[in-house]
């Protein structure tokens, strides 16, 4: 499994609860560009429309060698999930008010997959506590050596 793109802010902004592995419907130039690591999940979000799952604002840079047959920079892409998984996600999202967050894009058996998570947003004070605990742990490691 080779990770192509990560979402750096996901674990900082959200409590990650349940993860799913979804396939992506992509064009050829998008696949080649992602293989070079030219993608960003910073502003991307997942939504469900008519029992189908999509990702919006997942930016993939244009592939340099495709010329005029290049893909649009930010287009809505379809995610491939099992029908039962979509029902589970929809039910939990409606009941608990959770968000669907893309965490990473990776190669698995020659196919590009995306790891999505049901997540609960963190409050501002939760983020401060997380930063504080990380700095304390870092200082302890520096003082006493790594565990």
UniProtKB/Swiss-Prot annotation:
Knockout consequences: May not be essential, 1 disruption mutant has been isolated.
GO biological process: trans-translation
Alphabetized Pfam families for the sequence: SmpB
GO cellular component: cytosol
Signal peptide stretch: none
Cellular localization per UniProt: Cytoplasm
Keywords: Cytoplasm, RNA-binding
Cross-referenced SUPFAM superfamilies: Small protein B (SmpB)
Keyword match Cell membrane: no
Highest taxon listed in the record's lineage: Bacteria
A GO molecular-function annotation: RNA binding
Recorded family membership: Belongs to the SmpB family.
Function: Required for rescue of stalled ribosomes mediated by trans-translation. Binds to transfer-messenger RNA (tmRNA), required for stable association of tmRNA with ribosomes. tmRNA and SmpB together mimic tRNA shape, replacing the anticodon stem-loop with SmpB. tmRNA is encoded by the ssrA gene; the 2 termini fold to resemble tRNA(Ala) and it encodes a 'tag peptide', a short internal open reading frame. During trans-translation Ala-aminoacylated tmRNA acts like a tRNA, entering the A-site of stalled ribosomes, displacing the stalled mRNA.
Protein's UniProt name: SsrA-binding protein
